[in-house]
């Protein structure tokens, strides 16, 4: 990530998990590969302002070093998601799941496996397909999988964010362990054929200029194969991949909050009198 812009001292960034209080509805927020809960925090704050309980999970191996990310797999990431889901389930309110990039794929797996326990799903620039050159590269180097925890792929320029100020302060590793990249491709390949099993209401938000997870390939596949009878696509015009912190983050937060708010539990008469 290039931090050589004007400000030599970017502000301190909180990359830790967060739980924001609310009532009547809980939301599980899942960040992407090499990311941190920070990239879901603005969205979480806006949802909490609407009195939605929000839990931003930290996926296993993240918020640490590239070496730490190379020691885990998609099974560990999904375990982090399930732990977060169980934490919210204890409150007894309806739960929605919201995932960015790889987090969108993990959200889809949770929706498939939890069924009616989830009220709705939101996928933000989900990583079901990488660009063709990246897919071909990973396929070509797959025979080196035994060395995957010692091989790193460089992300030139850091995170794919259009807004320069947001890109400058965005935390995250710009070295991607080959093992983690292969785990993402395996996760996506396992979840894609099961999208038809998702029947919860679904919202998909994706940027047309996304170069990490191409808009046409991903949105066409998801909208065609998602089993939900109610599904909606929102296309962003200015942002790149990390849409929760990019130029249109306010619109993303507004669209998500409006969509999930209708799943809030209706207070009973006795509860309303308390």
What are the functions of these language-model segments?
Residues 99-103, 107:
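Gly/Ala-rich beta-loop-alpha elbow adjacent to hydrolase catalytic centers
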Residues 211-218:
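Conserved alpha/beta-hydrolase "acid-adjacent" motif
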Residues 234-274:
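Catalytic active-site module of serine/aspartate enzymes centered on a nucleophile-bearing elbow/loop
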Residues 122-133:
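Active-site nucleophile loop of the alpha/beta-hydrolase fold
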Residues 198, 204-206, 210:
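Short beta-strand/loop motif that positions the catalytic acidic residue
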Residues 47-66:
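Conserved alpha/beta-hydrolase
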Residues 15, 177-194, 200:
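Active-site nucleophile elbow and catalytic-triad environment of alpha/beta-hydrolase enzymes
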Residues 34-44:
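The serine-hydrolase catalytic nucleophile loop
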């Amino acid at each position: 990530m290039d931090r050589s812009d004007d400000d030599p001292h970017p502000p301190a960034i909180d990359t830790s998990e967060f739980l924001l209080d609310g009532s009547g509805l809980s939301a599980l927020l899942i960040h992407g590969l090499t990311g941190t809960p920070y990239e879901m925090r603005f969205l979480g704050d806006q949802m909490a302002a609407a009195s939605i309980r929000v839990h931003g999970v930290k996926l296993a191996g993240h918020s640490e070093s590239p070496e730490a990310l190379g020691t885990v797999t998609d099974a560990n990431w999904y375990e982090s998601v399930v732990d977060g889901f169980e934490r919210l389930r204890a409150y007894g309110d309806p739960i929605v799941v919201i995932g960015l990039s790889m987090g969108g794929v993990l959200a889809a797996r949770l929706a498939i496996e939890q069924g009616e326990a989830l009220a709705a799903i939101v996928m933000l620039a989900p990583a079901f397909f990488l660009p063709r050159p990246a897919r071909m590269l990973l396929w070509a180097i797959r025979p080196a999988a035994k060395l995957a925890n010692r091989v790193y792929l460089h992300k030139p320029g850091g995170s794919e964010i259009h807004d320069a100020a947001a890109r400058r302060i965005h935390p995250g590793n710009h070295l991607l362990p080959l093992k983690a990249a292969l785990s993402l491709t395996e996760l996506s390949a396992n979840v894609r054929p099961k999208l038809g099993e998702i029947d919860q209401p679904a919202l998909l938000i994706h940027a047309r200029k996304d170069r990490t997870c191409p808009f046409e390939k991903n949105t066409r596949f998801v909208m065609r194969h998602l089993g939900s009878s109610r599904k909606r696509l929102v296309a962003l015009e200015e942002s790149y991949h990390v849409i929760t912190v990019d130029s249109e983050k306010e619109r993303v937060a507004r669209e998500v909050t409006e969509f999930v708010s209708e799943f809030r539990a209706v207070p009973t008469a006795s509860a309303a009198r308390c």
